[in-house]
Design a protein with these regions (language model features):
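An acidic, low-aromatic, low-complexity terminal/linker signal
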Residues: 1-95
Length: 95
C-alpha cells in the first residue's frame, strides 16, 4: 500500500457551529442554495425537491434533523451526494 492510499480526500462543511466531512467520492457536486420546491412531508428536515439537469432531487436539512441551530446565508450550499443509485441534496452552511 502506498502512502497516498493512506489518505482519504474529504469534503468538509459546517452545520451550525459543527464541522462534518463526507468522502469526496460520495459528493457529486456542490451548488448554490436555492429554495427547494415544497413537498408534503411529516418531518421538518425534508425541505423539498430541486430539479437538477432534468432529475428531481430531494433536499434534506440535516442540521434540523440533528437539532442544530443553523441559518441560511449567502454562503449556504446544497451538497449533492450519491449513494448507490440514490441522489440527494444536503443543505450546509459553508463548504
Amino acid at each position: 500500500m502506498s502512502q497516498q492510499d493512506d489518505h482519504q480526500q474529504l469534503v468538509v462543511f459546517t452545520l451550525g457551529a459543527e464541522h462534518y466531512a463526507l468522502p469526496i467520492q460520495a459528493v457529486n457536486e456542490i451548488i448554490r442554495y436555492s429554495e427547494p420546491r415544497s413537498v408534503a412531508s411529516r418531518t421538518d428536515w425534508v425541505r423539498g425537491v430541486i430539479s437538477l439537469r432534468g432529475r428531481i432531487v430531494p433536499v434534506y436539512d440535516v442540521a434540523a434533523r440533528l437539532g442544530l441551530r443553523s441559518e441560511l446565508t449567502e454562503q449556504s450550499k446544497i451538497v449533492i451526494v450519491e449513494a448507490g443509485s440514490e441522489t440527494a441534496g444536503v443543505i450546509v452552511d459553508t463548504v
